[in-house]
Amino acid sequence: MQLNSTEISDLIKQRIEQFEVVSEARNEGTIVAVSDGIIRIHGLADVMQGEMIELPGNRFAIALNLERDSVGAVVMGPYATLAEGDKVKTTGRILEVPVGRGLLGRVVNTLGEPIDGKGPIDSDGFSPVEVIAPGVIERKSVDQPVQTGYKAVDSMIPIGRGQRELIIGDRQIGKTALAIDAIINQKDSGIKCVYVAVGQKASTIANVVRKLEEHGALANTIVVVATASEAAALQYLAPYSGCTMGEYFRDRGEDSLIVYDDLSKQAVAYRQISLLLKRPPGREAYPGDVFYLHSRLLERSSRVNAEYVEKFTKGEVKGQTGSLTALPIIETQAGDVSAFVPTNVISITDGQIFLETDLFNSGLRPAVNPGISVSRVGGAAQTKIIKKLSGGIRTALAQYRELAAFSQFASDLDDATRAQLEHGERVTELMKQKQYAPMSIADQSVSIFAAEKGYLKSVELNKIGDFEASLLSFMNSEHADLMKTINETGNYNADIEGELKASLDKFVETQTW
């Protein structure tokens, strides 16, 4: 069949008339640059801030920089096999991690994937890592204690459920030890724990997990790990993942405790990402939003009221408040608490436990400096008996520090000053405590009672530890009912005071230490 020129012309006109111009939004883009875990993508028509972008090989990146003609994203994991020209897709969702009771007793990475070799995790679903913190109306004031098991902390710097208490100090002076002991002390309290390790050596984390297991606390704990060798993106996101896992319990009317070890390394990872994304640097080369990095994380730790829990659980849980208590850790350089990140976190939290190198080196462990350590809201949550007995402890230690410095220059001291110095020395000695040996409320009460009522005056300084060990052994064997009552009620009245006094008088007569 032959077509003449007129027919061909008509056919072309017909085709042109039928042609429709359709604009189609693409959710696929092309990688145009890869370097240091950062990829630059062209062609993504519709992408959210923080959205997960699917990469070749079932990997993901997170969109952080949304620019006019490109998207800057940070790769979650290894990026060596990515190349310019690779196709990527948007997913329409932000990062989510598994949550639920199935995570308790497990060691997971930032994405909630198990890394302990114990098989898959039976989770209750997924939750986004970035959520808005509960509002003022949904919160309840802090009035229940979290016992760390440390005399120095529970007596002078009490922590309440829903509080944010910073642990700050130089490297290698017991910050992690304090936090781990606080977790170990929760094994029978019903408080679920989350330990987030950021930027640490894998061997150090393995040691922590082993210690938790040895002391029976791992079954009650979720360990979230982003080691020093992992991508900066995973180190930056690990605290948010851990927080989401802890919020699962808070929102269902339970109490949980989370340790961020440590936020200095998270800030460094975020600085690295920001500089690679060409964001303008500020003080100490940190980006302008490094305060918001920590504030939006720590504000999620709170005590929520019963209405919030009832609404969240759709009426399944009634009359229960929930809490998420945070113990963020910050590492200082040569005791400089006025650096950028330390001052930021101090201003966000409800108090700080300051550990000092000089105290640690002098043998005082935990090396808590009571002078600049403070708990802004924990006083309302403190156990009654500890609160009543420990009022003079902080004053005695603060005055002792002052007088000890002064006495180095004074040749002769009056009797009152000498008595104050001796009392301060004994209280300082009494505050020493071994690692992995948390004390019950009753044990702490007896020790503080002995110090406050003058029972240590006749004890030699180097025998204080032996005196305390013998006293607690005596009390737990001879006066078990009294100790049980104190542990269960936490009350302090004339009867309990009388019983404590009588039992200490009896013990002092034995001279068995």
Swiss-Prot record:
Protein name: ATP synthase subunit alpha
General function of this protein: Produces ATP from ADP in the presence of a proton gradient across the membrane. The alpha chain is a regulatory subunit.
Highest taxon above the source species: Bacteria
Membrane topology note: Peripheral membrane protein
GO molecular function, one term: ATP binding
GO cellular component terms attached to this protein's record: plasma membrane; proton-transporting ATP synthase complex
Gene for this chain: atpA
Organism: Shewanella piezotolerans (strain WP3 / JCM 13877)
Subcellular location as annotated: Cell inner membrane
Entry keywords, A to Z: ATP synthesis, ATP-binding, Cell inner membrane, Cell membrane, CF(1), Hydrogen ion transport, Ion transport, Membrane, Nucleotide-binding, Translocase, Transport
Family listed: Belongs to the ATPase alpha/beta chains family.
InterPro entries assigned to the protein according to its UniProt record, in alphabetical order: ATP_synth_asu-like_sf (IPR023366), ATP_synth_asu_C (IPR000793), ATP_synth_asu_C_sf (IPR038376), ATP_synth_F1_a_nt-bd_dom (IPR033732), ATP_synth_F1_asu (IPR005294), ATPase_a/bsu_AS (IPR020003), ATPase_F1/V1/A1_a/bsu_N (IPR004100), ATPase_F1/V1/A1_a/bsu_N_sf (IPR036121)
Residues the UniProt record annotates as site (Required for activity): S373
Enzyme class: translocase
Catalytic activity of the protein: ATP + H2O + 4 H(+)(in) = ADP + phosphate + 5 H(+)(out)
